[in-house]
Curated annotation (Swiss-Prot):
This is Probable glycosyl transferase Gly. Belongs to the glycosyltransferase 8 family. GO terms for molecular function: glycosyltransferase activity; metal ion binding; nucleotide binding. NCBIfam families: glyco_access_1 (TIGR03728). CDD domains: GT8_A4GalT_like (cd04194). UDP binds at residues 21-26, 112-113, 230-236. It comes from Streptococcus gordonii. The gene is gly. Disulfide bonds: none annotated. Mn(2+) binds at residues 112, 114, 230. InterPro entries: Glyco_trans_8, GNT1/Glycosyltrans_8, GT-D, Nucleotide-diphossugar_trans.
Amino acid sequence: MDKLENKSMANYDEYRAVVICASFSDCNQVLTTIKSIVCHNRFIKFYVINNDFPTEWFVSMQKKLAKLDCPIVNARVDASLVSNFKTDISYTVFLRYFVADFVEEEQALYLDCDIVVTRDLSEIFAVDLGSHPLVAVRDLGGEVYFGEQIFNSGVLLINVNYWRENDIAGQLIEMTDNLHDKVTQDDQSILNMFFENRWVELPFPYNCITLHTTFSDYEPEKGLYPPVIHYLPERKPWKEYTQSIYREVWWFYQGLDWSDIQEPVGALTQKMVEGEDDSSLSCLVYTYSCDLLHINYLIQALPSCHFYIAAPVVVAEPITRLLQYPNVSVSSDIAGIPALLESLEAKSQLLLDINAGDEVGDIIARFKSSGKPVFAFDSTVHGQQGQEVFPADNPEVMVQAIEKLGLAEPEERQISVLSIDQSLDYLLEKGASVVRFGDGEMDLIAGRGIPYQEYDPELSARLREMMAMESNERLMICLSDVFTGLERYSIDAQNFWKAHLQHHLADYLEICRAPWYGSTFISRPYIDLEDKTPSAGYFAKLKQLWQDKDLLIVEGLTSRSGVGNDLFDGARSIKRIICPSRNAYSKLEAIKQAVREHADNRLILTMLGPTAKVLVYDLVQEGYRALDIGHIDSEYEWFQMGASHKIKLSHKHTAEHNFDQDIEYRDDQAYDSQIVANLAQE
């Protein structure tokens, strides 16, 4: 087993092969897997290796997938394909052996049909297979239970050329014929025996087996899901009981209409799965017993409340019957799945202590320590643990209390943002660095790419982490000053921010818990202001930041900040590092190294979109001072023009004109002489 290396993450101009093997009895699962992939990816060529799918199914799928630039191939296996092999085993047992017989591409991603994909697959396809036959994720269950270093065969990146040239299918069929009755895990055992010490390891998130999360310290970025979720046979999400985490993710993709799948989404977010309205109440009953006092009455009296009923043992028929109600979920036999219980606790605002028999574990104490209420009847209460107790002969009283709990308005919390003046004064007084968060960064945090930066889960996680930080004398964290007083801005700006906050205010309130933030608008101090008279003072303070200082400007290829104006005339000297105008995050390490080589004691100014936030933060940890002041050049140009609206600049990048079209670069020897590194051309 070797460690993986990545190829260049270039844009794909060819199809990438995904292989699924199944019988038609699993067509609903195949459909769900395909929907999950095309929700986040384009230019995927699907090969469904099968022996019984109707032609009409493929005709229907071809029509749907063609609109998404994703063809599908009916890779049908029949007796003629295996006639040259001496075996008495049905070929349906080892359909995936035939990948190289159908796939035209050099590599193929094989996926079981009990899998959903929640992100762009580019990182997996970028793995360099070299001379290795396949890439896979280590099977943590095999390691924990049997001490075996094996891979799970549900996700395989296959070197198709290698398989074809070495007749891997023939060799695997021969081994299967000889050993099939001596192995415990069918073709997974055969594949591990055959490829022992010849496979490359892929990280756990790319085959996140729901039952194996207990054995891994991996946690997805907050608000997101693992890139590839794999549901094991005994606890499938399409069965009646909830017996694994991420069940709701499978049902989200299963329920997607094809009309819902338009532009690819970088990553599935919890908000997408749970919906915009997360105000509904949920409660948990955790029980050994099927005797739950007044449970039918409570469920019917509270149709807007969701009841999670869970048991560490297999539930009995009286519990199963409760699934007739749309506001009930049942989790059976979950004793060995702590992650599922934790998930149910997190979803529930209330614990109902209404079960006969013993309390399960310390569930009451766990809810109380989380600050969540526990309601009990006087005949079912388990000890005196701070429960709110209601009369068993009048369950309506408990219903009223639960309704009141659901109607309670959450405490209003305001996000405090300093004014532009206050923020600039802080930078001048403290000598702090600064990072600024705007609508583009929130889009990336929410799982969507923006015109000049593709979605990247690592970037998204880092942005979210920084947005939650408190400012200090070394680094000021800034937000857009739009949570109050929108009347300060132009009508267009007001409308934009109202729409933005309609979608993302809850995200800001969840993430941004620092006592105060600086203003992102320190570098946007003109065009969106209704009253533009203070702008001259703002620019004067900005210029004080670099007056008589040596500067290192880190910017995109088209930015050309300060070219053609006097914005940086007060600086002692200027050096520039030129970076890609798009997807600069892919060059982050190279950019940091270039900064180290040329920074000396210079003040670093960054104009590099979302990448600038991470760059500044990392540089501050290394002892540099850096200011993220993107868009400052466009704002200053408009200020000098006295513009009343956003005018496109002909000779360089213009804020909000994100595609950099029709730029006529002017020769500027001073600008050219300042460039000490050009990473945009590497």
